[in-house]
Every structure is written in C-alpha cells, then in structure tokens.
Amino acid sequence: MEPLDALEKHGDIKKVLTEKLATLPTSPGIYQFKNSAGRIIYVGKAKNLRNRVRSYFRNSHQLFGKTLVLVSHIDDLEVIITSSEVEALILENNLIKELKPRYNVNLKDDKTYPYLVITNEPYPRILFTRHRRNDGSIAFGPYTEARQLRSILDLIGSIFPVRSCKLRLTPDAIASGKYKVCLDYHIHKCKGACEGLQPEDEYRQMIDEIIKLLKGKTSALIRSLTENMHLAATELRFEQAAEIKAQIESLKRYAERQKVVAADMVDRDVFAIAAGEDDACGVIFKIREGKLLGSQRIYINNTNGESEASMQLRMLEKFYVESIEPVPDEILLQEALSEEEEETLRAFLLVKAKNEGQEKKGIRLVVPQIGDKAHLVGMCRQNARHHLEEYLIQKQKRGEAAREHFGLTALKELLHLPTLPQRIECFDNSHFQGTDYVSSMVCFEKGKTKKSDYRKFKIKTFEGSDDYAAMDEVLRRRYSGSLTESLALPDLIVVDGGKGQVNTAYKTLQELGVTIPVIGLAKRIEEIFTPHSSDPFNLPKTSPALKLLQQLRDEAHRFAITYHRKLRSDRTLQTELTTIAGIGEKTAFKLLEHFGSVESVAQASREELQAVIGAKAGETVYTFYRPEG
C-alpha cells in the first residue's frame, strides 16, 4: 500500500482528509464523502475501508469523468464499520435510497432486495417477494442475490414437504372437500393438507422447524445432509451427491445472512459506548423499519474514572433531549440501567413522543446478550471504538499544535522578535579527535520538523579541531550561494554552543549582510546566550520555549552524529580494502556500495567481484581473501 506521506503529496487531497485517512480501519463497511457544506455527496461500500477510500486519492491522476469531479468536491468523510462486506452492501443500498447522494448513480433506482416470507395463513406458504407485508407474515432477509434466495427455497422444498399451491386452505374449505391433491403429493413434496391429510398442528410444527433453520440453527441439518451426501457418493449416486453438496453450500451461505437489517420492521435505536482514560464516545445507530439508516456520535471529556453505565445514561439523556427524530419503539443498550434510571428515561421518552404526536404505549429498553440484537450492539460498539481512537489522535494532535504554538509565542516574547519564529534553523558540529569534521542543519516550521530542508556539511576549509572556524564555514555555505536561493530564510537561527559560538555566528551573519536573530543553547545546564550579552539566562524546565529549543538542539545533534558515524564507518571499512595492492579508495567504495560490508566482499565469488570492479581488480581482491588459490 502507498504510504500516507506519499498520498499527502497529491495536490487534490484536502488537509482535513489527511488525518482521517491515517486512521481508517481495514474492516469492511461503508464510507460517506461530504462536500464543503457538510452534505453527503457519495456513499460507497468496501471490503477494506482503508484500501478503498485511499484509492480515490492515490490514483487520482488516473480518474476521469464523474469520479474526477467527485474527488474534487470531497472535503470530509465518515465511515460506518460493518461485520462483513454483505452487510456493507445492504447498508450502502439503504443509505443511498434514504439520502440520494448526488454522485451515486448505480443504486438510486427503486430496486429492492428480495425477502423470504412465511405467510400468515392456517397452512403458511413460503414465498419469494421484493415487497414487505404488514399482515403478520414473517420475513427473512434481505438477500443480496435472488439466485441465493431461490436456492434456499429449493433447499427448504427438498427437506420439508411445504405446500406450493395458492389455495385458500381454511378449515371450512378443507372440510367441504372442494380441493384435491396435486402432483406434489404423489411425489412426496406435500402431505395433502388440502384434503385434510395433514393436521394443522403437524404442519405448524414443520413451519417452526423451518423458522429455526432460517434463524441460523443449521448445524444439525448440515451434519445430516453431509451424511446423506457421503452415503450417496458411496452408493455411486454421484448426481444426487452433487445436488446435496449444492444444498449444503446454499445453507452455509445462508448462515452468513445479513444482520444489519432486522426482519421485524421495528423502529429502534442501538447505543454503545467506548471509553478511554479521560474521554468516551457513544454511537447511536438509527434503525427505521428494520433498516440501518445512519449513526450519530456523542463525546464526553474528563470522565475521571466514571463507569460506562453512568456515561451511557449521560449520553442518552443528551441525545434524546436534543434529538428531533421520532422516538423509537425499542432501544438496545450496551449497559443495563438501574430500575429508577430506566423508569425515568422511559417516562421522558413517552412524554417526548406524545408532544411530537406519536402514540406509544411503551418503549422497550433492552440489553441483549445473544442473537441479532446483541450483534447490532457489538457492531455499534466497534464503531464507537474506532471513532474514539480517531478522536484521541485528533485530540493529541491539537494538544501538540497548542504546545508548539505556545513555544513559538514564548520565544517571540522572550527574544523580542518582530514576528513569530515560524521557521527556525539549528546548527550543530561533530568530529572525533579532529577527524571527519561535519556539521548539520535542521529546520523546524511551525514547531514541527521539516526534514526536506535538512542539510549536512563536510568541513572543507581546515583540518583539525576548530569549532568556531567550522561554524563560520557552515553559515557562509548556508546563507550565501545556491542554498540561499533554494531554501527560505529562517526567522531565527539557533546554534549548539555558548558565548563563543553565538558571537562567531553573529559576526559571520553580519559580514554576509544577513539580519536574522541568532541565539545559542549550551548543553547540560541549558543556558541561553545572545550576541554581545555578557551573561546567559535560564528558563524554567517547564517553559514551552525551552522545550522547543531542546527539541531543535537534540534533533540537530542527532542528525550530525548520524552523519559523522557514517563517514567514520565508511572510512574504517575502506581501510582494509585499500590495504590490498592495486585497490584504491574509489574501488573500495564501489565494492562497499555494492556488497554492503567487507564481510560480504570477502565472501563474494570471482565472477561477482569482476562484474563490479573489472576482471583484473576483481581477481586481485578474490585472491587476497583466498591466498591458498
């Protein structure tokens, strides 16, 4: 996957999206793109939210037509995590039909996913339908594929002798003898209920078994079918075995049926909470007519060890006081309320419903432990955890930004700078007994590192140890010539050192005609030096200005030490190779650059060495490490 810092380089990605892209989960779910007005302009589903959403921006140069226009209007995004891609597909369909986003074109039609319905009759039928009934019939679904639903109907028909006729089998009609059995009875697909050959209670018992099957209690049935499949294969009835295998696969697919949409058509809210040390996030799923139409979030701060049950009650009260949505028939909760709390909340909701013209006899408050309702609460809690994590990351970044701003403001006031030091450059020297003398320059912009503007210098104008001369050389190279043209000038220069370093830096800058404030920060006791000041001054250890200066100084020191160690390592490694007759520094460097270490050079074959440095030199190095020939 392309890293986030690469995504940030694309010009078409807004800054507000960058942080959200960094926290996207890899779970399945739906994503909603919003425009600058906060309006949802597109809803999509994904098996992996992180990969799918990032693909819009990673490959933006390859987009065309409406998709390109869509991306140009994206200002924000929200996600809802689901348990499977199938759930995401159902939720996507529901949201598109409800919200009608501008850039959704594929699911705006009125096509409805099919349901399996058990009719409300003395001898119920099992039907395929795309329209829900409100006559007491029992519905299961929806199904994303009509083919899958038809295979389940075939499966049920192959296991249970359910009637397929459209006859109105009332007790009087059956008793009158007006109906006769059809072919299904003779091929054992029906038990002749139309002629009274199957009692109603026996038929009802069979329907109850089918309902159990449709509710997911399929393990025993699968075991039975598997035994039948093996028996058929053993008896060489391969066609029948294949049919049974297909039935098992259909049954297994059904076991993974959709749970986002509840079949009972009840209007309900689902509430769950996720809590951190000091913050908590509550998520409310809004389910209307069995469809999950969206979610809302509530955050509370400074929880101070408050229980999740207590926070849940606070959030529920806040949500329903402010909500303009109709009061649902049922609320699924993560934590149980006390009897008094439950009665208070229920009474408030009933009054609210009455004031809004709703007629409700009662409102169910349920803490489900198993089944589809528990699944909904679990999915809601998973979303709460995700949003809390995202919130805490944003909170941390806001805190860091505040500290950085305080640090810059404190520096401006402390040093009497004309403007806020948005860009600061810091220099540090490093050497070992006068050898491999180097210097580093690091850059902070708005209190954060800007590594693309880091520079490292190898001292060229003298040999030995002279920190002042090194500082003079580095500042001249930085603030004159090509670097002055390629890099913006800073608002403040910081050098690692005391009075001598600061005065040297000031003198060099004066000679170059550079009027940028410069200060020094000495190690150990953290004294701050300014040019021409006889005495340094100290800042409190908790000062945001001091912390920012320490970050700068430590980063410059780290960068210088890293470069210095690399030079020493390269020089040390080249020493052994350059002792080989006929091998100079350039050849040694080529070997190290290709093989990575002296050990790898020593173990290389003759052919490998010759491919890098030529036949003669390769033979020389190969023979050096294998004197025996």
Curated annotation (Swiss-Prot):
Protein origin, superkingdom: Bacteria
Keywords: Cytoplasm, DNA damage, DNA excision, DNA repair, Excision nuclease, SOS response
InterPro entries to which the protein is assigned, alphabetical: GIY-YIG_endonuc (IPR000305), GIY-YIG_endonuc_sf (IPR035901), GIY-YIG_UvrC_Cho (IPR047296), RuvA_2-like (IPR010994), UVR_dom (IPR001943), UVR_dom_sf (IPR036876), UvrABC_protein_C (IPR050066), UvrC (IPR004791)
Keyword Ribonucleoprotein recorded: no
The UVR domain, residue ranges: 219-254
GO MF entries: DNA binding; excinuclease ABC activity
Pfam families (alphabetical): GIY-YIG (PF01541), HHH_5 (PF14520), UVR (PF02151), UvrC_RNaseH (PF22920), UvrC_RNaseH_dom (PF08459)
Function of the protein: The UvrABC repair system catalyzes the recognition and processing of DNA lesions. UvrC both incises the 5' and 3' sides of the lesion. The N-terminal half is responsible for the 3' incision and the C-terminal half is responsible for the 5' incision.
Organism from which the protein derives: Chlorobium chlorochromatii (strain CaD3)
Ranges for domain GIY-YIG: 26-105
NCBIfam families associated with the record: PRK00558.1-5 (NF001824), uvrC (TIGR00194)
GO cellular component terms, A-Z: cytoplasm; excinuclease repair complex
Subunit relationships: Interacts with UvrB in an incision complex.
Record's subcellular location: Cytoplasm
Protein's name in the database: UvrABC system protein C
SMART domains with a match to the protein in the record: GIYc
Similarity section: Belongs to the UvrC family.
Main location: cytoplasm
Keyword Cytoplasm assigned: yes
